[in-house]
Design a protein with these regions (language model features):
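Structural signal for conserved beta-strand scaffold positions within catalytic alpha/beta enzyme cores
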Residues: 36, 73-75, 134, 149-151, ...
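A short acidic, often aromatic-flanked loop/helix-cap motif at beta-alpha or helix-coil junctions
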Residues: 78-82, 140-142, 156-157
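Short, basic/aromatic-enriched C-terminal tail that caps enzymatic domains
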Residues: 193-208
Length: 208
């Protein structure tokens, strides 16, 4: 059974970038882990409780089919990852020892958000024996060398959209709304002759 580790700088990044693929991998009986590094408490709008994103994270990942035993949520401060990159690296090294993942799904090296950039660069250092794919974050990517596409069914995309709907506190930050992600999946699907897909770029691929 393949072990797949999703690295999300903030809660909801994994759902945005590879939520459909997470559903697909779980359906194919892969052992999928999801690690969020920040619940972005400072970005929670007024009117929502301070634990809003933590609770939304639990609901969203449950919607995707993830086991709660395969979830980890750290408490790093949003937009401050560059100042604590060594701590983040050490957490990743421990994750590598504890989980020994075969495949990492993480932000692209071309992601301009400072927190996403730290996760990408430190992941490359920490998970030296794992294959690594960078997922698409259209809001932040300068470019994306989309050289891996994953076929997705309509139901898998629906589960991704349902997971994103769980993040009530973040709706105003989703430019284009939830429909944007459905339309993006359609565009990626058209590129490879199917209805829906998600794309990734190969950072490192290991054949054992």
């Amino acid at each position: 059974m393949k072990k797949i580790l999703v690295l999300a700088p903030h809660t909801d990044d994994g759902e945005c970038g590879c939520g459909g693929s997470i559903v697909k991998f779980i359906e194919e009986e892969a052992d999928v882990y999801y690690v969020g590094f920040s619940s972005a408490k400072k970005s929670i709008p007024k009117g929502f409780p301070q634990n809003a994103t933590e609770e939304e994270f639990k609901k969203a990942t449950h919607t995707l089919g993830l086991s709660k035993n395969n979830l980890i949520l750290f408490d790093y401060e949003v937009r401050n990852f560059p100042a604590v990159r060594q701590d983040i690296l050490e957490d990743m090294v421990k994750l590598n020892k504890d989980i020994a993942p075969d495949i990492i799904l993480m932000p692209s090296f071309n992601d301009t958000h400072q927190d996403h950039s730290v996760i990408a660069s430190e992941s490359f250092r920490a998970f030296k024996s794992a294959s690594i794919l960078g997922y698409e974050m259209p809001y932040n990517n300068i470019t994306l060398n989309a050289n891996v596409f994953i076929f997705l069914t309509e139901l898998q995309i629906k589960k991704k959209l349902m997971a994103l709907e769980c993040y009530k506190s973040q709706k105003m930050r989703m430019r284009g709304g939830i429909d944007f992600f459905e339309n993006l999946a359609k565009v990626r699907g058209i590129q490879i002759g199917t209805k829906y897909a998600e794309c990734f770029e190969i950072i490192r691929w290991i054949i054992k």
